[in-house]
Design a protein with these regions (language model features):
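Metal-dependent catalytic cores of enzymes that make or break cyclic nucleotides
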Residues: 2-311
Length: 311
């Protein structure tokens, strides 16, 4: 089966951005900006083409376990406490979950610990207490790109934002960030290029560096990818654990029973696994409201619109 893996993961990053925007007020296209900054830095370090593609995938999915983390931790803490915990980066759980989830994604190179250690500090004060020379370059790059985007794009695009980013990186060199990554960032980006994020032209440049093209994968790999996305969607709400996988399995079973050929059966499974991905853009207050949704109907209709956007 042919899949544009980069395009599919890019679409998933949009859905993840919706969750982060709801929870910690991060701007739209956060995942893509982190990916763009990361691959530009990867080019500076002369990473080969396959490694750049894998770096882009890891950057797009660096917070892939956010819904799982939220679902499990909300059972222990209030939403207010959880938001503060995420902003402070005082937990390593979403890194552990995220690293484990990536086992379902078909990488071309070794990306071990790219997600697990993407919140580590250069001086060893991060969640796992690993110093910069114990952390893969990919994780160090994503860490810097993630923080830069959060600081630089948490408000309007202004010159003072660039100054804020510069001062933050300089002040935390050899503390939060290793000097090599900081130097790479400053060699690549200027205030003018940083301001270009305003018009989203960076996205075109991202796909020029990491081309979107269809690749052929076996059914097991395609199923793993679909299950990966379904898991992210189902953790969005406490009412939908394994819901998408259940729909996928039943849709495939019905298709087989009605005489569909094997390829059509597989496509029905994929459709079932992804049928609720639009819910990622809907607030949990609406999804879990134990009452009629008359007032929320316009927002609920957006689920279909968001599904089409992701699709």
């Amino acid at each position: 089966m042919e899949i544009d893996i980069i395009g599919l993961i890019s679409a998933c990053s949009y859905a993840l951005d919706c969750i982060e925007a709801e929870l910690v007020n991060i701007k739209n296209k956060h995942g893509k900006r982190v990916a763009y900054i990361s691959v530009r830095m990867g080019q500076y370090f002369d990473l080969p083409e396959d490694a750049l593609q894998d770096l882009a995938i890891c950057a797009l999915l660096h917070d892939n376990a956010l819904t799982q983390y939220i679902s499990e931790e909300l059972q222990k803490h209030s939403a207010k406490d959880l938001t503060a915990d995420l902003v402070a980066n005082t937990t390593n759980l979403h890194c552990i979950y995220g690293e484990r989830n990536l086992a379902k994604i078909p990488f071309k190179t070794d990306v071990t610990n790219a997600i697990l250690y993407h919140h580590e500090h250069a001086d060893g004060t991060g969640p796992f207490h690993k110093k910069w020379d114990e952390v893969p370059l990919s994780a160090r790059i994503i860490h810097l790109a993630d923080v830069v985007d959060i600081i630089g794009h948490s408000g309007a695009f202004e010159t003072q934002r660039w100054d804020m980013v510069k001062q933050y990186l300089i002040r935390h060199t050899d503390k939060l960030f290793d000097a090599a990554c900081v130097d790479a960032f400053f060699h690549i980006f200027s205030d003018n290029e940083f301001a270009a994020f305003r018009d989203d032209s960076f996205e075109t440049k991202l796909w020029e560096i990491v081309p979107r093209e269809k690749q052929t994968f076996g059914w097991e790999t395609c199923k793993n990818i679909a299950d990966f996305f379904a898991q992210i969607v189902d953790y969005k709400s406490s009412f939908t654990s394994r819901h998408s996988i259940g729909v996928a399995e039943k849709a495939a079973a019905f298709a087989a029973y009605n005489g569909y050929d094997p390829t059509q059966v597989q496509k029905m499974y994929l459709a079932g696994a992804l049928h609720d991905i639009g819910k990622m853009a809907i607030d949990n207050d609406i999804l879990e409201k134990p009452d009629k949704l008359t007032d929320e109907l316009p927002a609920k209709k957006m689920e279909t619109t968001c599904w089409n956007t992701v699709y």
